[in-house]
Amino acid sequence: MSKNSGCLALRIKLDDAITYGTARGALRIAKEALRQAENKGLPGEIEYFKGQVELIKENFTSAIEHFDAAIKYNSKDGAAYNDRALCMVELGIIDKALRYFDKGIEVEPDYANIYHNKGWLLNNIGRHSEAVKYFKKALSLEPGRAVTYDNLADALLNLSDYKGSLQAYKKVVSLLKPGCCKQIRRKIIAQIRSLEEKLWKSGL
């Protein structure tokens, strides 16, 4: 997360809500963050959180305009590049999205989220081996990211690395906070059982 941000705690809270919560909850936090940025008179943060509100509402073109404005105020804001890239993915602009992820990595190379999201995109377009490298880089920066282990497990599964995938899924379960993400937890436990059965049948 951008260390140059004037609202770092709010950005982290919003990121957690987007990753593990609901769209409604994330929108509520984004609007509260926007109000606080306005009260503090932080134009770059105002544009960033306006972009987040539009992104959550799935108004991707409008969100891009706000993220571009945020970047003009703070050219070192890796999160703004990252979220612009995510909007481009939603609009089907894949090659340029990859370039924006790279720009974010260039200006903020220690921001794990960008590596995670670039890995997510690479995995989705069939570049699984490359995706694994980006997920592992994200985890080297932020070892407790359950969502990254989840995506790493999927990429390894796509590469038929069943043992590696199983280990990654088990790591997800160990990192999820007790009582939260129940639906995600059930899904992952089912995947673990499926992989264990597959490995048992193959004698691995």
PLM feature segments, named:
Residues 15-19, 45-56, 79-90, 113-124, ...:
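Conserved alpha-helical positions within TPR/SEL1-like repeat arrays
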Residues 33-36, 69-70, 103-104, 137-138, ...:
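Canonical positions in the second alpha-helix
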Residues 36-40, 73, 107, 141, ...:
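Structural marker of alpha-solenoid helical repeat scaffolds
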Residues 150, 154-180, 193:
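TPR/TPR-like (Sel1-like) alpha-helical repeat modules
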